[in-house]
Swiss-Prot record:
InterPro entries: DEAD/DEAH_box_helicase_dom, Helicase_ATP-bd, Helicase_C-like, P-loop_NTPase, RNA-helicase_DEAD-box_CS, RNA_helicase_DEAD_Q_motif. Residues 120-141, 148-170 have a biased composition (Acidic residues). This is ATP-dependent RNA helicase MAK5. Residues 183-205 have a biased composition (Basic and acidic residues).
Length: 817
């Protein structure tokens, strides 16, 4: 019997078993050593039986007891193991045995039939010839009773010779395996049926045997003889053909050098544009030039070719870097335009058979020290005013070198010279205008005066175009400025060498491209997102550029379009330089991508095959509209520019049309069409069917933005409270702010509601949006009876037309005359 325990007292604590802590066993320090992964014996990964095939993981292997070590300094990866040499050799031997077993198994499934009891399958790759002959003799003796042993012995040598002949001359077929099987009664065994796994193994086996049984005499038999041209001959002939494809005889009238003509031929520029044919001879003659041409007309090469010609004509032979001075200074308003000018000049020089000049790009977002080193050796300097002045003014000796330039180019001059902008440009121009010697210098000292040419280019020179469209219209004439008025406007800003520089206007009658189609869509201010999405549905898989007036609009529209499965990319001035370049590169690479940008992308960007430009907001000035629309219909291509107009923007749109499409005094008064900007009508039924998608996407985008804004505000207030030594409580702060009413309270209430949305609610909205996006937009046809009419079934099956809609969709009216 068990001994009775005493009754526990309330004052005594209950007895508990004391937990014995197990001490960790001391780790045995096993020495590790570096080893190559190829020197280890790998184990095969067994696949589950439920899979019919390996699903792309055929031959998957694994290894154990190997550590991956990354060097903290260099970042290189190395592999270490604790196994000894004996263990590694055992693993390798097991791996070889496994591979031999796999090879035998492949032999069985490849050539049909299974070996009988007591028979071995002899492989050509592993079994030597002598063993093969002996095995064949034994099997013949056991299988055939009609021949004597003497006959078999006499034919042994002949059989070995036959085996050797098979080894040498066997074709790349699976019949090279030497094996014999017994005949059972009726005859030969039927071939075994193979599944997917066995068929894949068979294909690999046949390919390996074909590679190993290739005759070495085939290459020797055709020694000294070629059957057609070689690879290098084909490439050489192809390069010659490409060079001869373009005829550059139209450029010969400009008296360019042979090297430049070769570069133009390789770049496939068959003839000069109007601005190029007009300005290049004047610049090469030494004149100061003011060039006005529509966007996309080739203004970069108009001043780039004469600069390269001057570099080739007066190439400095001095190898001393200190004596080297830059040839040209090109100033652009934005980083993107400066990088694009650099890329165009580099491409022109790279295609030529001459030593290219050193081109330095000086823009913000990059290291100042590196740019300063590049300026010391540069032949051509391209940059923005702010960073140029920062680098030049803080450098040692760079100011004196910049004063020796022979070409000063001001691209997009209307923006650079506008009042109140780019103060650094004024400082640079003042430095270049100081030609007189200092007071302390002796009069006898000779000062070398530099013959500098000043080249000014832009698409707009009208001062009235820079006025705000949202303001009240001022009295007076808003017609295009004449040549005399434009020159007076520029002579006040820039000190030209000549009293009357050459003014060249390539498009006096219009400032827009000839093949540009302009359209206008009227909608409510709160429905701009919906009509933007509807408009993009009519242009599927086409590269589009959307312009806004604010960075916040870019940050809101980009996730809004991304939620709708559209490849949208952002671009604005607050982005890092690398992120801006990344967005532009992705926009160029993807054919149907969409770029949502501010006016930082309105000037100079040359992106090929941009078919659509959408103005989400009315531009602040008319010249901005001209440059925005100039991103499409470039280089004689066609394009569309569509403005989404809210009721409060109607007055600004009227002033925009009056300013942009006004006629100059000397322009011919011919009118081809009865309108300048066509009003486009989108089917309201289609817009109504797209509204649920747009509403959900807008909710999701607003939620993400509201949450980010709340976190940033909390961080700012919390940091301010810590600086003041006060405790910050967000709930108390909101209670005190509840009583305040005024402008913006409704917006703040919506932002608060959006920021409080849970993850579950967001996932539910995303699932609902995915369901809507998986369906086509029905234009009013019967989805159950597709052949009843209204649907082109042949086009639907072939995947032709606009695949976003179910049914026929009319265009927006651009094609109607």
């Amino acid at each position: 019997m068990k001994r009775a325990h005493k009754a526990p007292k309330a004052s005594h604590k209950a007895h508990k078993r004391q937990k014995v802590e197990k001490k960790p066993r001391p780790e045995i320090n096993v020495p590790k050593r570096k080893i190559r992964l190829d020197d280890l014996g790998w184990n095969q990964v067994s696949m589950p039986d439920r899979l019919e095939d390996f699903e792309g993981f055929y031959g998957l292997e694994e290894i154990e007891d190997v550590h991956v070590v990354k060097d903290a300094v260099t970042g290189n990866l190395s592999f270490e193991t604790t196994k000894t040499d004996e263990q590694i050799e055992q693993d390798i031997e097991k791996a070889w045995q496994r591979e031999e077993e796999e090879a035998k198994f492949l032999e069985k499934i490849t050539f049909g039939g299974e070996p009988k009891n007591g028979e071995d399958v002899v492989e050509e790759e592993t079994a030597p010839v002598e063993d093969t002959v002996e095995a064949t003799q034994d099997e013949d003796a056991a299988s055939w009773g009609g021949f004597s042993d003497d006959d078999v012995a006499q034919n042994g040598d002949e059989q070995s010779e036959d085996v050797q002949m098979v080894e040498e001359d066997a074709p790349p077929t699976p019949n090279v395996v030497l094996s014999t099987t017994k005949a059972d009664g009726d005859g030969e065994a039927e071939p075994k049926k193979m599944n997917k796994r066995e068929r894949a193994a068979e294909k690999k086996r046949i390919a390996a045997l074909a590679k190993k049984t290739k005759k070495p005499d085939d290459d020797e038999a055709s020694e000294g003889k070629t059957f057609g041209p070689g690879a290098f001959d084909i490439l050489a002939n192809r390069a010659d053909d490409e060079d001869d494809e373009v005829d550059v005889s139209a450029w010969e009238e400009l008296e360019l050098s042979t090297k430049i003509l070769e570069s133009l031929a390789k770049l496939k520029f068959s003839k000069p544009t109007t601005i190029q044919a007009s300005t290049i001879p004047e610049i090469m003659a030494g004149r100061d030039v003011i060039g006005k041409a529509s966007t996309g007309s080739g203004k970069t090469l108009a001043f780039g070719i004469p600069i390269i010609e001057s570099y080739l004509a007066s190439k400095s032979k001095s190898k001393d870097v200190k004596d080297k001075t830059p040839l040209a200074l090109i100033i652009a308003p934005t980083r993107e335009l400066a990088h694009q000018i650099t890329a165009h000049l580099t491409a022109l020089c790279a295609k030529g058979a001459f030593e290219a000049p050193l081109i330095a790009s000086v823009t913000g977002g990059l290291a100042v020290q590196k740019q300063r080193r590049q300026l010391e050796k540069a032949d051509i300097i391209v940059g923005t005013p702010g960073r140029l002045w920062e680098v030049i003014s803080t450098g040692h000796g760079l100011l004196e070198k910049v004063k020796q330039i022979r070409f000063l180019v001001v691209d997009e001059a209307d923006r650079l010279l506008s009042q109140g902008n780019y103060k650094e440009l004024g400082e640079i121009l003042k430095i270049l205008e100081k030609d007189a010697p200092a007071e302390g210098e002796a009069e006898a000292e000779e000062t070398t005066e530099v013959e500098r040419q000043t080249l000014v280019f832009s698409a707009t020179f009208q001062k009235g175009l820079q006025q705000k469209l949202a303001g009240k219209a001022k009295g007076g004439s808003d017609n295009l400025m004449s040549k005399q008025q434009s020159m007076e406007y520029l002579l006040k800003k820039i000190n030209f060498r000549e009293e009357k520089p050459k003014f060249i206007d390539a498009n006096p009658s219009s400032q827009m491209a000839s093949k540009l189609k302009e359209g206008l869509i009227e909608c409510a201010g709160t429905e701009k997102d919906l009509y933007l999405y509807s408009l993009l549905m009519f242009y599927p898989k086409k590269r589009a550029l959307i312009f806004t007036n604010s960075i916040s609009a870019v940050r809101r529209l980009t996730p809004f379009l991304q939620n709708l499965a559209l490849p949208a990319l952002p671009l604005h001035s607050s982005m890092a330089q690398k992120a801006r370049l990344r967005s532009i590169e992705r926009f160029k690479e993807r054919p149907g991508s969409i770029l949502v940008a501010t006016d930082v992308a309105a000037r100079g960007l040359d992106i090929p095959k941009v078919e659509l430009v959408i103005h989400y907001h009315l531009p602040r000035a008319a010249d901005t509209y001209v440059h925005r629309s100039g991103r499409t219909a470039r280089a004689e291509a066609s394009g569309s520019s569509i403005l989404i107009c809210a009721p409060e923007e109607v007055g600004g749109v009227r002033r925009l049309i009056a300013k942009v499409h006004a006629r100059a005094d000397e322009a011919p008064k011919s009118k081809k069409t009865a309108y300048f900007i066509r009003t486009l009508d989108i089917d309201r039924r289609i817009v109504a069917r797209l509204k649920p998608r747009a509403s959900i996407s807008k909710k999701l985008a607003d939620t993400v933005i509201a949450k980010e804004k709340k976190h940033s505000e909390d961080d700012t207030l919390r940091q301010a409270a810590e600086d003041l030594g006060v405790d910050y409580d967000s709930e108390e702060f909101e209670k005190e702010a509840k009583g305040k009413k005024g402008r913006g309270t409704g917006r703040k209430k919506k932002e608060k509601e959006a920021s409080e949305m849970t993850k579950g609610e967001q996932q539910a909205l995303r699932a609902e949006l995915r369901g809507l996006l998986s369906q086509r937009i029905n234009t009013g046809v019967s989805a159950r009876y597709l052949t009843s009419g209204g649907i082109d079934v042949d086009a639907l099956m072939a995947g032709e037309g606009n695949m976003e809609f179910l049914g026929n969709v009319d265009g927006l009216g651009f094609d109607e005359e």
